[in-house]
Amino acid sequence: SYIKGKVVAAALQNKSGEFLKPSVAAGAKALNGISLDKDLAGKNPNPTAKGAYPIATLTWVLAYKTGNGDNAKVVQDAFNYMLSDAAQNKAPSLGFVPLKGDILAKSKAAVNKIGK
């Protein structure tokens, strides 16, 4: 999430030379521009896109492909909700960046691999 309330955030310079304060829009430019590999690891922690905030990161959650037993469906349901349109549409009001495009698609595919 980004800074709210009476705290003043510093504007940081990104690789495009812009000075930006943290916001959902600037975070979205950064996070949704990350290219993920098959293990959902990104390679560019300092985005080059115009309008992208230079310090942004994803929240990582580890889940097992096997060994979940009877909890597998509950775990999948929880992650599927987090990645749903309903949850992603709430993200900005909570100070988080909604996931879109490749990151969202790869995250949903990873959830489908969670098994018993």
Model-derived regions: residue spans:
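Bilobed periplasmic-binding protein-like "clamshell/Venus-flytrap" ligand-binding domains
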Residues: 91
